UniProtKB/Swiss-Prot annotation:
It comes from Shigella dysenteriae. PANTHER family: INSERTION ELEMENT IS1 1 PROTEIN INSA-RELATED. This is Insertion element iso-IS1N protein InsA. InterPro entries: InsA_HTH_dom, InsA_N_dom_Znf, IS1_transposase_InsA. GO terms for biological process: DNA transposition. Keywords: DNA recombination, Transposable element, Transposition. Absolutely required for transposition of IS1. Pfam families: HTH_Tnp_IS1, Zn_ribbon_InsA. Belongs to the IS1 elements InsA family. It comes from the Bacteria.
């Protein structure tokens, strides 16, 4: 089995241990020095290009907040926040 050197993204310490898995099955790690929990493969879906436009388009087409969040694989609060901010910017 191959060994991979993992460093904490906050303090760059090599004193890291496995700290379980996230709901998608990706490994989580914890730093022994700063106690930060992090993942190596984390993607923030709401930051991808075009997500804000899709949220507003789905809202205009009558999709609910929960349906939009489930379809786009983002949080319900992200959908609500995006709709509020888009309405204020008009």
């Amino acid at each position: 089995m191959a060994s991979v050197n993992i460093h904490c993204p906050r303090c760059q310490s090599a004193q890291v241990y496995r700290h379980g898995q996230n709901p998608k099955g990706h490994d989580r790690f914890r730093c022994r020095d700063c106690h930060r929990v992090f993942q190596l493969t984390y993607t923030y879906e709401a930051r991808k290009p075009g997500i804000k436009e899709l949220i507003t388009e789905m809202a205009f087409n009558g999709a609910g907040v929960r349906d939009t969040a489930r379809t786009l694989k983002i949080g319900i609060n992200t959908v609500i926040r995006t709709l509020k901010n888009s309405r204020q910017s008009e």
